[in-house]
Curated annotation (Swiss-Prot):
One of its GO terms (biological process) is seryl-tRNA aminoacylation. It comes from Bacillus cereus (strain G9842). The lineage of its organism: Bacteria, Bacillati, Bacillota, Bacilli, Bacillales. GO terms for cellular component: cytoplasm. It catalyses: tRNA(Ser) + L-serine + ATP = L-seryl-tRNA(Ser) + AMP + diphosphate + H(+); tRNA(Sec) + L-serine + ATP = L-seryl-tRNA(Sec) + AMP + diphosphate + H(+). PROSITE patterns: AA_TRNA_LIGASE_II. This is Serine--tRNA ligase. It comes from the Bacteria. The gene is serS. Pfam families: Seryl_tRNA_N (PF02403), tRNA-synt_2b (PF00587). It is found in: Cytoplasm. L-serine binds at T231, A232, E233, E285, S385.
Length: 424
């Protein structure tokens, strides 16, 4: 959520920056109308309440003096009715203003490339050499099915499309990657491990920006009004909702493994085979709470931490600086890390690393004090995938495949695979 005072005094500037996102600003124009009316109602209501108090005191004086107070009593009733009407209108205006504020996306950072679509994203850097195969490489779903380590067909029978059973060495590889990533981020990068709940309430989804705008993309448990988490970002960020932290606690860095659940409502017909787009998948998420002046340095560190996973796995990748039209709703700046997938003949996203500045913290009321008695300020929050496990499995299967259909296990994972070197 944006700062309402900043928006009030910089309305045209904010509007111009949001236009770079390609947003429909039809409703945005109502801000000035609602904000002005709200302030008018606050003034009018306070004036009437003050008058009501004065009249009430006058009535008390007249009654003590045994004088007729009927006219003032009638006047106070009329004032009371007006106060009630103004309070009702104020409540409606504030609810409308709150809904509008929750629907306004974050302001892009000045360093984000200006553009409309993914075609305008900018390559920040690449790492590793794309392997030249001496044979026609197979897609990971064919490799895994032939090896008996992934079963899409039976998962479709048990649940439906976009689900999978991991079996044997496939399940072991998934588990190995989870342990490897958590060990790397906690032992070498300084994150604290968290295992979060997989269901959250509506306030949590609102705090991180999934609600109210993207409710159709979420899996909701209607009987409880809980939501299955689309990412560990939601529960982990909301750990500190409605809290005031001390300066000495910052930065806070969490690494959280979780399963993630997404409806993929807008992805019909895309990536219908394999692990790239599943309704349920595992991920290691990195979440940070930092002082505002440190957040862009921390974004670079977070992105480097996610990149390190791919470097140790020796998987070629590139880092994209996302343009203003492809930032998503909550990010002020975002990098996508894309890993090379041979069957696609291109790079595919495996991590998004974002700085939300105070956008989430304002929604979730997460603040800190620089001094013990100082005025609370909003922290800046960041998060990034470190990494998506299923897509990492897909990248390993395809990049490490051999002509006979076997898979070489990356050296860094072998201790987690019982010393095994090949999946066959």
């Amino acid at each position: 959520m944006l700062d309402i005072k900043f928006l009030r005094t910089n309305f045209e500037e904010v509007k111009a920056k949001l236009q770079h996102r390609g947003e429909d600003l039809t409703d945005f124009g109502r801000f000035e109308e609602l904000d002005t009316r709200r302030r008018e109602l606050l003034v009018q209501t306070e004036e009437l309440k003050s008058k009501r108090n004065e009249v009430s005191q006058q009535i008390s004086v007249l009654k003590r003096e045994k004088k007729d107070a009927e006219a003032l009593i009638l006047e106070m009733r009329e004032v009371g009715e007006k106060v009630k009407d103004f309070d009702n209108e104020l409540r409606t205006v504030e609810e409308d203003l709150e809904r509008l504020m929750l629907s306004i996306p974050n302001i892009p950072h000045e360093s984000a490339p200006v553009g409309e679509t993914e075609d305008d994203n900018v390559v920040a850097r690449t790492w590793g050499e794309v392997k030249e195969f001496t044979f026609e490489p197979k897609p990971h779903w064919d490799l895994a099915t032939d090896l008996g380590i992934l079963d899409f067909e039976r998962a479709g029978k048990v649940t439906g499309s976009r689900f999978v059973f991991y079996k044997g060495a496939g399940a072991r590889l998934e588990r190995a990657l989870i342990s490897f990533m958590l060990d790397l981020h906690t032992d070498e990068h300084g994150y604290e491990e968290v295992l979060p709940p997989y269901m959250v309430n509506r306030a949590s989804m609102t705090g991180t920006g999934q609600l109210p705008k993207f409710e159709e993309d979420a899996f909701r448990i209607e009987s409880e009004d809980y939501f299955l988490i689309p990412t560990a970002e939601v529960p982990v960020t909301n750990m500190h909702r409605d809290e005031i932290l001390n300066k000495e606690q910052l930065p806070i860095r969490y690494a959280a493994f979780s399963s993630c659940f997404r409806s993929e409502a807008g992805s019909a017909g895309r990536d219908t085979r394999g692990l790239i787009r599943q309704h349920q998948f595992n991920k290691v998420e990195l979440v940070k709470f930092v002082k505002p002046e440190d957040s862009y340095e921390e974004l670079e560190k977070l992105t480097n931490d996610a990149e390190r996973v791919l470097q140790l796995l020796e998987l070629p990748y590139r880092v994209m600086s996302m343009c203003t039209g492809d930032l998503g709703f909550t990010a002020a700046k975002k990098y996508d890390i894309e890993v090379w997938i041979p069957s696609y003949g291109t790079y595919r996203e495996i991590s998004s690393c974002s700085n939300f500045e105070a956008f989430q913290a304002r929604r979730a009321n997460i603040r800190f004090r620089r001094e013990p008695n100082g005025k609370p300020e909003h922290v800046h929050t960041l998060n990034g995938s470190g990494l998506a496990i299923g897509r990492t499995v897909a990248a390993i299967l395809e990049n490490y495949q051999q002509e006979d259909g076997t898979i070489i296990i990356p050296e860094v994972l072998r201790p987690y695979m019982g010393g095994k070197t090949v999946i066959k």
